[in-house]
UniProtKB/Swiss-Prot annotation:
GO terms for molecular function: rRNA binding; structural constituent of ribosome. Transmembrane segments: none annotated. Pfam families: Ribosomal_L23. The lineage of its organism: Bacteria, Bacillati, Cyanobacteriota, Cyanophyceae, Synechococcales. Part of the 50S ribosomal subunit. Contacts protein L29, and trigger factor when it is bound to the ribosome. It comes from Synechococcus sp. (strain JA-2-3B'a(2-13)) (Cyanobacteria bacterium Yellowstone B-Prime). One of the early assembly proteins it binds 23S rRNA. One of the proteins that surrounds the polypeptide exit tunnel on the outside of the ribosome. Forms the main docking site for trigger factor binding to the ribosome. Disulfide bonds: none annotated. InterPro entries: Nucleotide-bd_a/b_plait_sf (IPR012677), Ribosomal_uL23-like (IPR013025), Ribosomal_uL23/eL15/eS24_sf (IPR012678), Ribosomal_uL23_CS (IPR001014). Belongs to the universal ribosomal protein uL23 family. SUPFAM superfamilies: Ribosomal proteins S24e, L23 and L15e. It comes from the Bacteria. Keywords: Ribonucleoprotein, Ribosomal protein, RNA-binding, rRNA-binding. This is Large ribosomal subunit protein uL23. One of its GO terms (biological process) is translation.
Length: 99
């Protein structure tokens, strides 16, 4: 595996499996947690390389951090950056293999 392919493989952390994300799959939109430093072109290249599909658009979002309190001390828990990837007509990603 070359260095560039290894970097692309590290960009996508995991797919997001929620009710909303599952409903988006019917519209050829897939949600992934990505590295906080990942850019849209890098996410597009990673999805196209790993799943052999054509990506039409990439939307990213970074949810606000959550406040956590332990006694009198206040801290924050960061939330992971997410990418919503829209695929071209006729392409799909199999996240749940048939058993």
């Amino acid at each position: 595996m070359t260095e560039s392919k290894r970097i692309l493989a590290d960009v996508l952390l995991r797919p997001v499996i929620t009710e909303k994300a599952t409903a988006l799959m019917e519209q050829r939109k897939y949600v992934f947690e990505v590295l906080p430093t990942a850019t849209k072109p890098l996410i597009r290249a990673a999805v196209e390389e790993m799943f052999r599909v054509r990506v039409t658009s990439v939307n990213t979002l970074k949810p606000p951090r959550k406040q956590r309190r332990v006694g009198r001390f206040v801290g924050y828990r960061t939330r992971p950056k997410r990418a919503i990837v829209t695929l071209a007509e006729g392409d799909s990603i199999t996240l749940f293999p048939d058993t």
